[in-house]
């Protein structure tokens, strides 16, 4: 009997394969959509920029005029001491949060709500932004970073600007240790060893004098977890012949 393979250990959900969420800053979203925002604006000040292990972009701690402190996503160029406004009468300026109906066409935005008051669901990745294409009665057309155009309720809020943290993927890791700790912070397991490179006790494709599966790589849908590796329930494999 061989050892349990990686998919079996991952499915068990032990601490090795769980994301260390106890280190995360928590939910990062817009402030509650209250009457103060619907009729005017709320003003806050950036008091601190923080690193969040859960994401690749910095987050800002903002202290609002009523004394409330909240972590929010901020655009490129934000610094400690900047003033942030939230509400229908907020100024059209990077970092401010307004309903889509109040934002002109062509302005870059991020952290867009899917439903009014849900805190933000779209365009939250580092360095990304969406663009308002057009306003219509009861709907706003927004082009997402993927290029897809989606309609939103005009009451949904968004933050003006380009999401901070851009260029993250352009910087090389250089060292394997950095890549390991980066993956570990999100619960990823790295490096991922190939089955044919393992010993026979560790994987069905392991062992032998040279690296090869040594058996058919197609596997039935109902086979047990310890054997279920390779092409699962494949209708065909390979490139196929030209007809």
Swiss-Prot record:
It comes from the Archaea. GO terms for biological process: cytoplasmic translation. PROSITE patterns: RIBOSOMAL_L2. Keywords: Ribonucleoprotein, Ribosomal protein, RNA-binding, rRNA-binding. It holds the Pfam family Ribosomal_L2. SMART domains: Ribosomal_L2 (SM01383), Ribosomal_L2_C (SM01382). Belongs to the universal ribosomal protein uL2 family. One of the primary rRNA binding proteins. Required for association of the 30S and 50S subunits to form the 70S ribosome, for tRNA binding and peptide bond formation. It has been suggested to have peptidyltransferase activity; this is somewhat controversial. Makes several contacts with the 16S rRNA in the 70S ribosome. Part of the 50S ribosomal subunit. Forms a bridge to the 30S subunit in the 70S ribosome. This is Large ribosomal subunit protein uL2. It comes from Methanopyrus kandleri (strain AV19 / DSM 6324 / JCM 9639 / NBRC 100938).
